């Protein structure tokens, strides 16, 4: 008996565990602090939080027998052009496909998207990190790059919310011991 799922087209499918309301109690109950400290991929959080933005969800992909293969942090706040906006910051090992799925792609990895000059930059763990525009569904904008040896995705709704990436976005990995008290 196994808890793994396989797709003929995409291979292994890792279970996605979602913390719907990321209160301190919910995060503790979900064991997220343990996940953050034992995850195989970064748990990226924009710090300081963008003005007017709030944490709205956290998810991990993987099973209880191994470290998380992907992490997702959801944020909501004002779009630079007015109205509400959503941002997903996703870290994943190559071949997992969580970022591509949220971007609205049929593929697992970004493929030839990561070429040429980048269209956005963030700071991840103190390092400038290039992001390239990825194909995406029409109702969102997606960017992808590499940080700490894994894919880093930023998926934003609506597409005009991509202007958020023009701000100085600084991502911190909650696995870092400096963030243990958060």
Residue ranges and their predicted role:
Residues 50-52, 80-82, 146-151:
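Short, solvent-exposed coil/turn segments at beta-strand boundaries
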Residues 54-133:
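Short, solvent-exposed recognition patches
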Residues 7, 75-77, 144, 154:
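Short beta-strand element of the conserved SAM-dependent methyltransferase core
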Residues 44-56:
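Proline-anchored loop/turn motifs at beta-strand termini and strand-loop-strand connectors
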Residues 1-36:
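N-terminal cysteine/histidine-rich coordination modules
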Residues 115-182:
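A short, solvent-exposed beta-edge/loop patch
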